[in-house]
Amino acid sequence: MSGIFYPGKLQASDTVGGCIDIFKNVWPNPEETIQMTELACSDPESGISWERATTTDRGVHQTKRTNYHLGISNAAEQGVSTAQNIQNQMYMLLLAAVGPYVEKYGVTGGLWHEPYSMLRYRGGQEYTSHYDGGTETARSVSAIVYLNDSYEGGHLEFTNFGVKIKPEPGMLVLFPSNYAYRHIAHPVTSGTKYAIVTWIRDRQL
């Protein structure tokens, strides 16, 4: 993939709900990313495939999510070139965006990236109301990159703030992982939604 452009620091295009920062058009090749990923997944020899998304942390959210995921970081470690390209691009993007974000909001601690995953939602799949992590998880900042908008539904809603975001191709959303930022990935009623997600921890576990 080409077209990475992350010199210096990225500033948010918009801020809503206190600490929800939206960066528009910061993933330069979203459609190409989807095409390359699906092409790799269609090859049984590629070493990369979609799996049912699971929540292993506390188990309490597993019944709330019905989407599929692709372990980008794990596949990259296994030498899958498509995953390595996505991994590198995501890392560069977060270097440019997360630093200014934590400075802006006075977030303390380290910046430890959890493995990156690509998510796929279709046919009514959703992730109902949840938050990404309490203090025991060390999750400080949540990051979502949206790759397309060729679907119906699939909005991101922060229930405590009355904020609903319509994903756009190449959009990055950063927000606190704590309970105040409980959110919903609404059902995709038509088409397929793709996103890349990770969480930034303030310490190693």
Question: At which residue positions do the language-model features occur?
Answer:
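Short, conserved beta-strand element in jelly-roll/cupin
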Residues: 118-123, 135-152, 200
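Non-heme Fe(II)/2-oxoglutarate
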Residues: 2-105
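Eukaryote-biased feature marking scaffold/signaling PDZ-domain proteins and nuclear chromatin regulators
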Residues: 18, 31, 43-45, 111-113, ...
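A short coil-to-beta-strand element that immediately follows conserved catalytic motifs
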Residues: 103-116
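Eukaryotic intrinsically disordered and solvent-exposed regulatory patches
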Residues: 103-105, 130-131, 181-183
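Catalytic core of Fe(II)/2-oxoglutarate
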Residues: 139, 150-205
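Histidine-centered catalytic micro-motifs
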Residues: 126-134
